[in-house]
């Protein structure tokens, strides 16, 4: 049994109502419920946190190490383009992670094209809406079982 942690960055608490043309109509609660169900069906444990505060995400990453978290799925949202601190926290705990974005950041404003995470992530999924989280979970479980 693996333990996975899903981290959602700033403004993702507004999913379903925030710019649905860019981010879709699925709520964060629906995404989390789907991931929890899929993990549970596979015999795994899934934790999640959404925060608009960078320090809360960093502290959660630090705690993940001592909790035995095996893999992290992270949508850093706006912190993607600004947070060296989150990047450093992920590197410090040495837990593999996949970066997820609902929208295709490469089709958006130029400042969104740069990520502080992509070069150290196992992989990046962007532009596939809420399905990206499901695909990231599947990929993480394949990585953990050696089927990747």
From Swiss-Prot:
The record marks 18 as: Transition state stabilizer. CDD domains: DHQase_II. GO terms for molecular function: 3-dehydroquinate dehydratase activity. SUPFAM superfamilies: Type II 3-dehydroquinate dehydratase. The active site is at residues 23, 101. Keywords: Amino-acid biosynthesis, Aromatic amino acid biosynthesis, Lyase. One of its GO terms (biological process) is quinate catabolic process. Catalyzes a trans-dehydration via an enolate intermediate. Belongs to the type-II 3-dehydroquinase family. This is 3-dehydroquinate dehydratase. It comes from Ectopseudomonas mendocina (strain ymp) (Pseudomonas mendocina).
